[in-house]
Amino acid sequence: SGNLAVEAEVERIEVLIKKEMTDLDAAEGWIKDNSKWDSIADHWLRIGAHYKGVDAEVNLKKHNSLIANLLYLIDDLAYAHHLGKLGLIEATYANWRNLLFIAEYIGQARALGMGVVSKGFCSSVLRIQLNHLLVKIESNISPSWTESTQQDFRTFLKVIKEQVITDTPSITPAEYFKLATGCIEHVLSEFDRKVEKIQ
């Protein structure tokens, strides 16, 4: 979005991702031989080298493509380790996989919303895109999540409706980024809990 208010947070996340990728590159086994992983690592390096020089829409498309490829890699991982064949997790497989898609919807809403609140303007195209994501996120809020998590999601969705998809967006980029990131973290924590049950 070109907003400098969250630049430090973006750089912090870049460092974390770089560490995780280095750890994965050093790991032995299945991922070393997976061409999708090589492609993802290369794609990430190219994004990291050029994201500051391209506009937000191009960055969003590149990140969406990267995330889609990560989700395919996770499917390959589940298949390679026969996770779908274990009776106890067949029912939960779609559930933990769905959590990753929810995180992606929130990530897209975060990226689009950051563009809106940074510019102080929401175009009709962005309203449609954000409303579409809002519906996807809202329909996936699970009653099994803690009340505080559900409340954070309701707050985030209310902010999108009332402070982002308006003629004059009224939330600061830093506040919006923090709200969206908090929801992503809730979903990823839930994902971690589901995966721990499988292990």
Residues of each region from the PLM?
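Hydrophobic alpha-helical segments
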Residues: S1-Q199
